Design a protein with these regions (language model features):
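Acidic/histidine-rich catalytic neighborhood of metal-dependent amide-processing enzymes
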Residues: 65-66, 70-135, 179, 331, ...
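Short acidic/glycine-enriched loop/turn segments that link adjacent beta-strands
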Residues: 14-17
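Acidic-glycine-rich active-site phosphate/pyrophosphate-binding loop
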Residues: 40-53, 120, 135-145, 263
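Single conserved hydrophobic/aromatic residue that forms the stacking wall/gate
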Residues: 1-9
Length: 335
C-alpha cells in the first residue's frame, strides 16, 4: 500500500518491526506531521476469522486499528494522485506492541514526535458516535502484597494475623480513592489470599488498575499508594508498580489542532464530535510531551477488543476523506 508514497525504514525489535514511512514529495524546512498507527491486534485469524456481512467487516484489527493504517495510506495516495500535493511532509509510524503498552516503541515515538509539529493518531473513533478522542485517561498498575501471620483457625484464632482480613479493609480504602466525577477510577481487579479455610491466611495479594484524566489526579493516587498503611498491627504491606501512561489532557495545543479538524470536517459536511476515552494510546505519550495531538482519526465500528470486532464499511470512505482533508489544512499549523 505504501509503494510510491515515500521511503520506508524498518527497525527490528523483539516484538516485531517498527515501520516509518516518510512522505516528503518536495524538499522543505517545514517540520513533518506525524501519524501514529499500530498493526498488532488483540485477536488472531484463528480466533476471529476475516469475513464480511453486508456493510460490516469482521476480523482482527479491522477496527483497532489496521483500518486506521490503511485509511491513512489511502488518504495520502488520494491527495498525491489527484494533484493535491501535500502541504507538508508526513511521517507515518507503525509499531507492533501498542496493545501491550508500547514498551519497545515508546522512546522511538517520543523521539519522532519531538521532530514533528503535530501528531495525528489513527486509532479508531468512538464506537457509537464516531467521535474523535480529544482527551484520554492515563493509567497505572499497582501490586500490593500483604504479609500477616498464619495460625490454626480453630485452635488458635487469636494467634494469627489475617492477611485476607487486612486485604478486605485495603480494598475498601483503595476504592474510596476514586473520584468518578473528575475521571478517576480505582479497581482492585485481582484479589487472592490464603491456602485453606481452616488456616488464618498469612499472605494476600491485590492487583489494582487506576485511571485518571489529569496529572494532578495521577499524583494524588500515586501518593496514596506510597503512603498505604496497614489497619491491623503486625501486618506488612509492600507496594510495587506505578503509573504506566500519562493522561492526554485538554490542552490549548490540542484544542488548536482540534479546531483545524473541525474545519476539515466542515468542508466535508461531516458532523464532527469529540469524546473522552478511558483507554490509553500512543497519543498519551506525545500529548504529555507537549506536542499537539489529536486521536480517534481512524475508522468507525464497534467491538473494541471483543470477538465481534467490526468495521463499518459504508463509512470508511468518509473517514479517509476526513484524514485527507485534515492533512491538507496543516501547512501553517505550528509554524
Amino acid at each position: 500500500l505504501s509503494r510510491g508514497l515515500g521511503d520506508v525504514y524498518k527497525r527490528q525489535t523483539d516484538v516485531g518491526d517498527q515501520l516509518l514511512l516518510q512522505v516528503e514529495p518536495e524538499p522543505t524546512d517545514i517540520k513533518p506531521i506525524l501519524v501514529l498507527c499500530h498493526y498488532d491486534t488483540v485477536w488472531n485469524l484463528d480466533e476471529l476469522p476475516l469475513h464480511r456481512e453486508k456493510d460490516r467487516l469482521y476480523g482482527p484489527g479491522v477496527f483497532d486499528m489496521k483500518s486506521g493504517l490503511v485509511l491513512t495510506l489511502w488518504a495520502l495516495r488520494a491527495l498525491l494522485e489527484t494533484g493535491h500535493s501535500l502541504p507538508e511532509p508526513v511521517w507515518v509510524f507503525c509499531n507492533s506492541d501498542e496493545e501491550t503498552g508500547s514498551a519497545a516503541s515508546k522512546d522511538r515515538i517520543l523521539q519522532l514526535s519531538r521532530e514533528a509539529r503535530a501528531v495525528l493518531v489513527a486509532e479508531p473513533a468512538e464506537a457509537v458516535t464516531g467521535s474523535l478522542k480529544a482527551t484520554r485517561k492515563g493509567n497505572g498498575h499497582y501490586h500490593v502484597h500483604i504479609k500477616g501471620k498464619a495460625a490454626h483457625a480453630g485452635n488458635d484464632p487469636l494467634g494469627g494475623i489475617s492477611a485476607v482480613e487486612e486485604m478486605a479493609h485495603q480494598i475498601l480504602h483503595l476504592h474510596a480513592l476514586a473520584d468518578l466525577p473528575n475521571g478517576t477510577s480505582v479497581n482492585v481487579g485481582v484479589a487472592r489470599g490464603g491456602t485453606r479455610a481452616n488456616i488464618i491466611a498469612d499472605e494476600a495479594d491485590m492487583d489494582v488498575d487506576v485511571r485518571f484524566l489529569t496529572e494532578k489526579e495521577a499524583v494524588r493516587i500515586e501518593q496514596a499508594f506510597q503512603s498505604l498503611a496497614p489497619v491491623h498491627p503486625g501486618i506488612t504491606l509492600t507496594v510495587t508498580g506505578g503509573r504506566s501512561m500519562p493522561p492526554m489532557e485538554d490542552t490549548s495545543k490540542n484544542r488548536s489542532l482540534l479546531d483545524v479538524a473541525r474545519q476539515a470536517a466542515l468542508a466535508l459536511d461531516y458532523p464532527l464530535q469529540t469524546c473522552s476515552a478511558g483507554g490509553c494510546s500512543d497519543g498519551n505519550l506525545t500529548s504529555a510531551a507537549g506536542i499537539p495531538t489529536l486521536d480517534g482519526l481512524g475508522a468507525t465500528g464497534e467491538g473494541l477488543h471483543a470477538r465481534h470486532e467490526q468495521l463499518y464499511v459504508d463509512e470508511y470512505p468518509l473517514r479517509t476523506a476526513l484524514m485527507a482533508s485534515l492533512l491538507m489544512r496543516l501547512r501553517d499549523f505550528g509554524c
